[in-house]
């Protein structure tokens, strides 16, 4: 599993990279990386078909712990998954926009 920073994530998003947020829906509604798709970690394996296998997918949570575990799951299922170190918290601390 690869890892990336929020700065690298911002550049990837500018290029159209997909982002999957594995937090619970209530957490997601409180604020998320713009354009992220919410697939809670408990639903990830049954919703794999919603994720594009042909492109690297960035995986985010609040701090990077859940997303790290879920990036491993995606990698094991044939995806090129990239964990976002520090998660949404690091994204917000960097001053980047939060979508609600």
Give residue spans per PLM region:
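Short, surface-exposed ligand- or partner-binding patches at beta-edge/loop junctions that are enriched
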Residues: 60
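Rhodanese-like catalytic fold shared by cysteine-dependent sulfurtransferases
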Residues: 1-18, 24-56, 65-100
């Amino acid at each position: 599993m690869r890892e990336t920073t929020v700065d690298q994530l911002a550049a990837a998003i500018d290029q159209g990279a997909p982002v999957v947020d594995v937090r619970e829906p209530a957490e997601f509604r409180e604020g998320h990386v713009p354009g992220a798709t919410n697939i809670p970690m408990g639903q990830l394996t049954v919703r794999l078909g919603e994720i594009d296998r042909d492109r690297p997918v960035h995986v985010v949570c609040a701090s990077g712990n859940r997303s790290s575990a879920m990036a491993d799951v995606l990698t094991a299922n044939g995806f090129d998954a990239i964990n976002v170190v520090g998660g949404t918290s690091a994204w917000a601390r960097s001053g980047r926009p939060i979508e609600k």
